[in-house]
Amino acid sequence: MTDIVYDKDADLSLIQGRKVAVIGYGSQGHAHALNLRDSGVEVVIGLKEGSTSRAKAEEQGFTVKTPSDASAWADVIVILAPDQHQRGLYADSVRDNLTEGKTLVFAHGFNIRFGYIEAPEGVDVVLVAPKGPGHTVRREFEAGRGVPVIVAVEVDASGKAWDLAWSYAKGIGGLRAGGIRTTFTEETETDLFGEQAVLCGGTSQLVQYGFETLMEAGYQPQIAYFEVLHELKLIVDLMWEGGIAKQRWSISDTAEYGDYVSGPRVISPDVKENMKAVLADIQSGAFADRFIKDQDAGAPEFLELRKKGEEHPIESTGRELRKLFAWNKADDDYTDGSVAR
């Protein structure tokens, strides 16, 4: 059975004795920085000139430096920019400021796993990945709880990288819930697979096909939306609370029987074979290569696919129906129906 690491197993003073630069102040960046500071760690924020996040970081009491200056100042550099921007950020601002004894921290292993970033000799490279979005990481920390983390070490030049990684994980509150040891390869490949095959790609396509099937059969779009998208949250919440078993325990006998007899007709064995092909593309680096090449070219495929998704009729139906939901409160910085960030 996997060993779980908790607060009692890690020495917080290790990260408290280091100067930490958090590069990026988005979802994960703000949570890591605030939690570390509340844990007694000296933190500065690294942001490019003109960054829209600068005002927020300064309002929350942080010193903001350029990524280059922050990296030169720090002992521990935490790179929390989007995957596609990390390579350029590292080359332009971080690499030349890395000296023996410093540590690079990532929350996702993409750029290390696929070779887009290579640290110089003498630098530790670690992964501390909370299994939740940044606002949840921060909220749980403030409540005296934590979000579970997975932790890995790619390069242990100092011989003490694991100890510092666990200390960092404790500093952001992750070991209150528990930490699991992994590798950069395992974290990256399973994370991408989960996103593509199940959580994002698989679920989005399943919902769209369900909506289209009901619409093509003559049912009202509003009813179709409720049945294949709106109620999905109710089912996922049950699965989150107690697994598939609790979800099946909570629904009617009719729904449970339909689950058993019709689920395999929709998600048939060939779907599993397709999943294996998706995983193979991830493992071989084919997906990463396709993504980065598209991003380097200005993201034409990415933007075309995003636009196509936004134009699906389920989106216009949803925008109208969500106006009826008194309990629905959108994020302040989100425009309903838009994927663009």
Curated annotation (Swiss-Prot):
Co-factor binding comment: Binds 2 magnesium ions per subunit.
Cofactor(s) the protein needs = Mg(2+)
Identify the residues that bind Mg(2+) 1: 191, 195
- GO CC annotations? cytosol
Identify the residues that bind substrate.
Answer: 252
Q: Which SUPFAM superfamilies match?
A: 6-phosphogluconate dehydrogenase C-terminal domain-like, NAD(P)-binding Rossmann-fold domains
GO BP annotation list: isoleucine biosynthetic process; L-valine biosynthetic process
Main EC class of this protein? oxidoreductase
Give EC number(s), comma-separated. Answer: 1.1.1.86
Keyword entries, A-Z? Amino-acid biosynthesis, Branched-chain amino acid biosynthesis, Magnesium, Metal-binding, NADP, Oxidoreductase
NCBIfam families from the entry? ilvC (TIGR00465), PRK05479.1 (NF004017), PRK13403.1 (NF009940)
Query: How is this protein named in the record?
Result: Ketol-acid reductoisomerase (NADP(+))
What is the species listed in this Swiss-Prot or TrEMBL entry?
Clavibacter michiganensis subsp. michiganensis (strain NCPPB 382)
